[in-house]
């Protein structure tokens, strides 16, 4: 377990592309962020989360996921997480309805959901760019951007009409996030990717979103 920011720890990288599984915590409450599949011989996200919660004496209150791609969301992982943490509520963007096999007890949201961890706000914002179910997770001034490609509105899925999000939707997602700080009176100043491959401090978040709204060729 690797602490990245106060209350935000990377439990490990799992699945075949090193998807991060995270623990968000405040006081004695926690949320598990990301529900990737376990692969033979690799770290198991459920065991990682259970060990961390036991070690820190935390009650897991929420189960979260940034988007519904196969390396980030697994039905068996969700089932096992719910069995391991029976009091935890899965809170997922409405687009997950088509991939969750047991929706009973799952809270689905459309645009934005405000949660609470031990008195600290936790925001889930639907902002499709990399995928149609993209959920940006904001906690303790840090935003997990999932698999968002930053500083350009382009995505790695632009070649595939079945996967790519319409450009106008991506632009609106960037603008929605630009408005977030003003509308919520909340300072976002840290950014990290769910794979744990990107970590930024002292970020001007609205400016970063304005850059991400532009059409730039970065690869």
Model-derived regions, located:
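Conserved beta-strand hairpin/beta-sheet module of binuclear metal-dependent hydrolase folds
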Residues: 1-51, 135-152
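Hydrophobic/aromatic beta-strand patches that form the interior of the parallel beta-sheet core
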Residues: 9, 64, 91, 107, ...
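Active-site-proximal loop/helix segment associated with metal-binding centers of metalloenzymes
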Residues: 18, 94-95, 101-110, 135, ...
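Residue-level detector of beta-strand face positions
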Residues: 23, 114-116, 123, 136
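Metallo-beta-lactamase
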Residues: 30, 37-39, 121, 132-208, ...
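Short catalytic-loop micro-motif centered on adjacent basic/acidic residues
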Residues: 31-34, 63-65, 124
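Active-site HxH/HxHxD metal-binding segment of metal-dependent hydrolases
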Residues: 39-114, 215
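Histidine-centered catalytic micro-motifs
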Residues: 63-73, 127-132, 192-197
């Amino acid at each position: 377990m690797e602490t990245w920011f106060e209350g935000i720890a990377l439990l490990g990288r799992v699945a075949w592309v090193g998807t991060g599984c995270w623990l968000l915590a405040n006081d004695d409450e926690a949320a598990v962020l990301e529900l990737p599949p376990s692969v033979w011989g690799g770290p198991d996200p459920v065991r990682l989360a259970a060990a961390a919660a036991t070690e820190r004496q935390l009650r897991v209150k929420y189960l979260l996921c940034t988007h519904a791609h196969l390396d980030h969301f697994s039905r068996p992982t969700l089932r096992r997480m719910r069995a391991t943490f029976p009091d935890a509520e899965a809170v997922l963007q409405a687009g997950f309805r088509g991939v969750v096999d047991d929706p009973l007890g799952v809270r689905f949201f459309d645009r934005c959901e405000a949660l609470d961890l031990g008195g600290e706000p936790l925001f889930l914002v639907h902002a499709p760019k990399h995928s149609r179910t993209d959920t940006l997770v904001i906690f303790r001034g840090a935003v997990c951007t999932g698999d968002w490609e930053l500083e350009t509105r382009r995505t790695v899925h632009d070649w595939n009409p079945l996967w790519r999000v319409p450009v106008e939707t991506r632009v609106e997602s960037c603008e929605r996030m630009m408005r977030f700080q003003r509308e919520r009176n909340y300072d976002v100043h840290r950014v990290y990717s769910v794979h744990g491959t990107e970590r930024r401090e002292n970020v001007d978040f609205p400016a970063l979103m304005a850059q991400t709204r532009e059409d730039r060729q970065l690869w």
